[in-house]
Design a protein with these regions (language model features):
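Conserved C-terminal guanine-recognition region of P-loop GTPase G domains, centered on the G4
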Residues: 74-141
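Charged, amphipathic alpha-helical segments characteristic of ABC-type P-loop ATPases involved
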Residues: 173-207, 212-221
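Conserved nucleotide-binding/hydrolysis micro-motifs of P-loop NTPases
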Residues: 35, 59-60, 91-95, 117-122, ...
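Conserved small/polar residues in nucleotide/adenosyl-binding loops
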Residues: 232-234
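Residue-level signature of catalytic and energy-coupling elements of molecular machines
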Residues: 19-20, 38, 56, 73, ...
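Canonical P-loop GTPase G-domain recognition
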Residues: 121-173
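Conserved G1/Walker A P-loop phosphate-binding module
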Residues: 1-62
Length: 235
């Protein structure tokens, strides 16, 4: 049976690696990502007979390619090196962590939100609406876990396998109408110019955000298009 490739993505200090290690134990393969000195850590596990290949991606705050870690993580995801993304967030600082979540949703890849540190949330008397949150995030599964106390681990892996089998992708993140018009125009131009058949929308959003890596890889030199986009900027 083919292994499901699962990427663990999250901010630094969100407990991502602790959660990763809870599944893999000492069964790890450590190397460097090609061309850089950032560690690539992989492990293996299984859930009800389904093998899983787990990849602990570097801790990042966004998918904007400013740091080596961000470039490595983004390249791994965009090159389809993972089948399912587990976005690990610190549930006690949810709003801050969801910036990366929204960027992951823009990719249109299968994403599961792992609300880590739920034990801290409960200790502080905080509440998270576990019914409303998935609706706000495009219908993705939201799973409360505690890597420290090892709770919710089976539920999370069940969600991974089910999500993979159902080929579920999040609903598209929608912006204001005038931005959507610009994104559509640019996405069409990217497809026509470079023959890209997937992720055109994401590349369009990144071009509007002045992402340097995407600007270098997919420059748009059509003056008519540029004039129509000149007043638009997504941060």
């Amino acid at each position: 049976m083919e292994a499901i490739r699962v990427g663990f993505v999250g901010n630094p200090n969100c407990g991502k690696t602790t959660l990763f290690n809870a599944y893999t134990g000492a069964n790890l393969k450590v190397a460097n990502w090609p061309g850089v000195t950032v560690e690539r850590v992989e492990g293996e596990t299984a859930y009800k007979g389904q093998p899983l290949k787990l990849i602990d991606l570097p801790g990042i705050y966004s998918l904007t390619s400013y740091s080596i870690e961000e470039k490595v993580s983004r390249k791994c995801i965009m090159n389809n090196e993972v089948d399912v993304i587990i976005n690990v967030v610190d549930a006690s600082a949810l709003e801050r962590n969801l910036y990366l979540t929204m960027q992951l949703l823009e990719l249109g890849k299968p994403v599961i939100l792992a609300l880590n540190m739920m034990d801290i949330v409960e200790e502080r008397g905080m509440e998270i609406d576990l019914h409303r949150l998935p609706e706000m995030l495009g219908g993705i599964p939201v799973v409360p876990v505690s890597a420290r106390k090892r709770t919710g681990l089976d539920v999370l892996m069940h969600a991974v396998v089910h999500h993979y089998e159902e080929k579920h992708k999040p609903d598209v993140v929608r912006y204001q109408e005038y931005l959507e018009e610009k994104i559509a125009v640019l996405a069409q131009k990217i497809e026509e110019t470079y023959g890209i058949k997937e992720n055109q929308r994401w590349y369009a959003i990144k071009l509007l955000a002045r992402d340097e890596e995407v600007q270098k890889e997919y420059p748009i030199e059509d003056s008519n298009i540029l004039d129509r986009l000149s007043l638009i900027h997504i941060s």
